[in-house]
Amino acid sequence: MRRVGIAVAAGIALADASIVTLGLPSILVELRATVEGVALVLGVYTAVLAVALLPAVWLCRRFGDAPVGAAGFGLFLVASLGCGASNSLGLLLVLRGVQALGGAAGLVAAFALLDGGRAGPGRRLWVAASVFGIAIGPALGGALTQAFSWRAIFFAQAPIVLPGLLVALQVARTEPADAAVRDPGGSSPFPWRAAISLALLSASLTAVVFLVVLLLVSGWSIEPLAAALAVSVLPVAAIASSRLPGDPEIRAVSGCLLVAGGVGCLALLPGASAWWTVIPQLLAGAGMGLALPALSGELIPERTRLDSAKLLSIRHAGIAVALAALAPLISSNLTSTIDTAREQGTAAVLDAKLPPEKKIEIAPDLFGGLNTDDPRGQLQKEIDKAKAGLSGDEATEMGNLGNRLDEVVTGAVRSAFRPTFIVTSALALLAALILLTGSGPAAAALTRPAVATAAIAALVAAGGYGIAYANSARETVKIGDPCEDRQLPGVGGISGALQDISLAALDRAACKFGSSREELLLALFDDRLQHKFEEEHGVNPRDLLSLGPAILGF
């Protein structure tokens, strides 16, 4: 039972990324962070862990596994409590680095204390620690975030690590004096081809863990617990496929191909529903279960502390690099696509057959303050507010408008995430190609039934999602040229006539400024967009000396 405590503590340190990921959207809002900022919450931990694992091997050789393990788990516990109490992103990131230092020491020591390099109960517990973390991480993180807050994720880690800390302290008191210099043999020659493939595969799997959660919770405003259940498909599929036998190189190649196909399907999501992510996650999870065990411990030996440290460093370095590269890309894409969605949504409002006073009331609120934190959730709140007091045809028109605006925003979010999914799918495919360049069984892998089946499954799934994506394409809201004549809403009555006159005047001004009428209207109501308009078009849209003559056509 003492070993179980060590294994559970190691499992939490290994599962950190999958647990914490579900809290990132809440951190994004509460700490007023950016996408790059919340990516660092994972990135700092994985990067520091990757760097600290090899020095931790030296510490274990110098001072003994149990003392280093106790110190590591103790540091991890204290830092976890500090993370939960953090009131700024900067402090949280510092403590995440401290947490990773403790995690690195604890993991290297745990491998030796469990005797993870030899076949038997210790090895099974070491492997179970990884599986345990992968399996419970998403569900635990989502449940804690929804029931309490993101802080509960870190507070909950402390009591889970505590038994491992106590066991390590107990072993340290009884460990032989010469334990500090013992080592179960030297490391084997390092297989760099498999190592590079492992790093690329780990980077690709980041898309399924980090990006899917961000897409579901921040992009599509799905509750954390529902998102946790959705992404739990990945570990379930991984655990199921990890039991399949076969040559490790064949399993590794097959797994990489399945991950590439699954992540590729995520780039072709036809709708804003968590259900559309299930099949891609099943593919990626099955690939993960095939490839990771084959690469970790089989193609890349894991017989000593140094072997284990190298292997974990490679995995976490791949994750850290992926986060560092993908976060700025997704942030830039979100900003760009939300700006486009803001203009398209405003165009839809202006063209809707609603009274002009209602348009004036809702247009700035619907899209003026729309940002990348939770665009769909913000939009839905404003739509619900706009529906209040409407009845009859106006209520119906507002309902139709709401549906169209929802399609605009969710489509923009999918477009923002698409390039990152394409890139990470390519990483998994590259991992498979690198394995195929070897001289072992993988060199002739394409002729093997397992690899052929994986390749066909990936292609069929990607093709099916491609067809569904093409068929789901709806007519986009077009931003009209203000310099050309266009059909006006024409709702009738005096107010309708005044509305048409106002829109025509807005077109004249936008034409003179070289902008769209939607861009001009938003700039009139939103300070940030006003400054952006002035930078792009060289004129202050709120300056009456500029706006007045432009409206009159002078």
Regions found by a protein language model. Name each.
Residues 97-130:
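Cytoplasmic helix-loop-helix junction between adjacent transmembrane helices
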Residues 79-82, 90-99, 275-283:
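Paired small-residue
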Residues 66-69, 76, 92, 252:
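Primarily marks hydrophobic transmembrane alpha-helices of the MFS/SLC 12-helix fold
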Residues 1, 361-453:
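Transmembrane-helix exit segments and adjacent C-terminal regions of multi-pass membrane proteins
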Residues 30-32, 64, 85-91, 102, ...:
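Helix-breaking motifs and short loop linkers at transmembrane-helix boundaries and internal kinks
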Residues 2-24, 32-36, 41-45, 50, ...:
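12-transmembrane solute porter fold
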Residues 158-184, 431-441:
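C-terminal membrane-cytosol helix-exit motif in multi-pass small-molecule transporters
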Residues 129-168:
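Helix-loop-helix hairpin linking two adjacent transmembrane segments in secondary transporters
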